[in-house]
Design a protein with these regions (language model features):
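Single transmembrane alpha-helix segments in multi-pass membrane proteins
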Residues: 72-122, 162-177, 273, 326-335
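Alpha-helical transmembrane segments within multi-pass membrane transporters and channels
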Residues: 130-185, 192, 339-344, 348, ...
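Transmembrane helix-bundle core of multi-pass membrane transporters
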Residues: 62-67, 138, 166, 170-174, ...
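Membrane-interfacial amphipathic/re-entrant helices at transmembrane-helix boundaries
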Residues: 2-90, 118, 131-149, 174-179, ...
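Transmembrane alpha-helical segments in multi-pass inner-membrane proteins
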Residues: 145-153, 290-297, 301-373
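Cytosolic-side transmembrane-helix boundaries in multi-pass membrane proteins
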Residues: 1-58, 219, 270-277, 281-284, ...
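Helix-loop-helix "hairpin" substructures at the membrane interface of multi-pass membrane proteins
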Residues: 83, 233-311, 334-340
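Membrane-embedded helix boundary and interhelical linker motif in transport proteins
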Residues: 62-65, 69, 78, 100-162, ...
Length: 391
């Protein structure tokens, strides 16, 4: 197309004019590249140890640059990777349901919340010392951690199957109605958690609905491992969390790519109508996908409650985490869920650890800002996600 560059005589839309001049695809990409380069240089070279930062109440965190404080850098990097493993466990289930069923399962965080409390109650019931908000790890055997995991996954899988069969199946194809149904389920679950959990409290102590509780890792995980990496010793429990995330990823890959059921699910993600037209009972496939997705939320709840805690309002938090991972990685993509989790983990941990804070706070809230910056960058250049495909 021959373009007349004279002002007032150039035909076409504004977007065509911009494309003709080569602005789109140049300035935004250059700005994104500059931001990424600056972020890397900031962490590696620029940032200072704790002290004044520009006057006033602003100060840097306790971490120096990677060059001047490689040990702290290595610990933050490991924290980011292990947190990403937990994100992947939870978000991969959300991605599976979203990718196949086109259901934005707003109750996914509620599966996590309920699963965490169920695991806590089971572990407390199994241990004669379980009369308080938490057990010490030396009091917990491997079986006393594995049993709550198995019970929690089974209960949440059954609950998820009930939600799918009784509520979602009869509204298949009505995306808005299904989203509203899952919102209703999440509200009901959150209220019931406040009303009934935790059951085990210290003797004589009042019970407040939705108290923060945690379950204990097995005793053998409560030590530090010398990784020979910048002389860093790191928590074995967090390394176990990383190993569990990798194991879940391998298991999902083998299931999705090496079994007939996985092949059908991947076909359903790509083209539900054609899969159904080939004589495959798509309702059974949907049920399997929903059960697996709910089970992964429960699995992640046990791991997350072991490493941290579970409390009311965390359902919304983990739903948001899952949404971010799916938006960044791409809907229905296992590799996208892994990469999205890793990127989110890196952004979350490094921004919280290396950016300035105010007053006596130990960390910053820039992780929230940079999370949305990550979303904006991905949506600007890959609206379908890094590994998603256009319809």
């Amino acid at each position: 197309m021959k373009l007349d560059r004279g002002i007032g005589t150039f035909a076409g839309s504004v977007a065509e004019r911009i494309r003709a001049w080569g602005v789109v695809g140049t300035v935004p990409r250059a700005a994104a590249a500059a931001l990424i380069v600056f972020s890397i240089l900031y962490v590696l070279v620029i940032t200072k140890p704790a002290g004044e930062f520009g006057g006033g109440n602003w100060r840097t965190t306790n971490f120096g640059s990677a060059i001047h404080d490689p040990g702290s850098f290595a610990r933050v990097l490991l924290d980011a990777v292990t947190f990403a493993a937990l994100l992947f466990i939870v978000a991969s289930g959300f991605s599976l349901i979203f990718g196949l069923m086109r259901v934005v399962n707003m109750a996914h965080g509620s599966f996590y919340l309920l699963g965490g409390y169920i695991a806590y109650e089971v572990q407390q019931s199994m241990n004669p010392e379980g009369q308080g908000f938490s057990l010490q790890s030396f009091q917990v055997s491997t079986w006393e951690w594995v049993a709550p995991l198995l019970v929690t996954v089974a209960v949440i899988a059954g609950f998820g199957l009930g939600v799918q069969q009784l509520l979602l199946r009869w509204n298949q194809g009505q995306d808005l109605r299904q989203a509203l149904i899952t919102i209703a389920v999440s509200i009901i679950v959150a209220d019931q958690v406040i009303a009934h959990f935790p059951r085990h409290v210290p003797e004589g102590a009042p019970r407040f609905g939705g108290n923060a509780v945690s379950i204990a890792w097995p005793g053998w995980t409560q030590r530090f491992v010398d990784l020979k990496l910048f002389g860093v010793e790191y928590s074995l429990a967090r390394l176990v969390m990383l190993a569990l995330g990798i194991a879940v990823g391998i298991a999902l890959y083998l299931w999705l790519y090496k079994t007939r059921t996985g092949m059908v699910i991947r076909a359903g993600v790509d083209d539900r109508q054609m899969t159904s037209a080939l004589g495959i009972n798509i309702h059974v496939v949907f049920a399997i996908a929903f059960v697996v997705g709910a089970s992964l939320a429960a699995f992640g709840a046990v791991v997350g409650t072991s490493q941290g805690n579970v409390a009311q309002l965390q359902d919304g938090q983990w739903l948001l985490y899952s949404l971010v991972v799916v938006i960044v990685g791409g809907m229905g993509s296992l590799l996208g869920a892994a990469v999205g989790s890793l990127l989110y983990g890196l952004v979350f941990m490094f921004s919280a650890s290396y950016l300035p804070t105010t007053g006596n706070e130990c960390c910053t809230q820039y992780s929230i800002v940079f999370t949305f910056a990550l979303l904006a960058l991905v949506l600007a250049f890959r609206p379908q996600g890094l590994f998603g495909r256009t319809a």
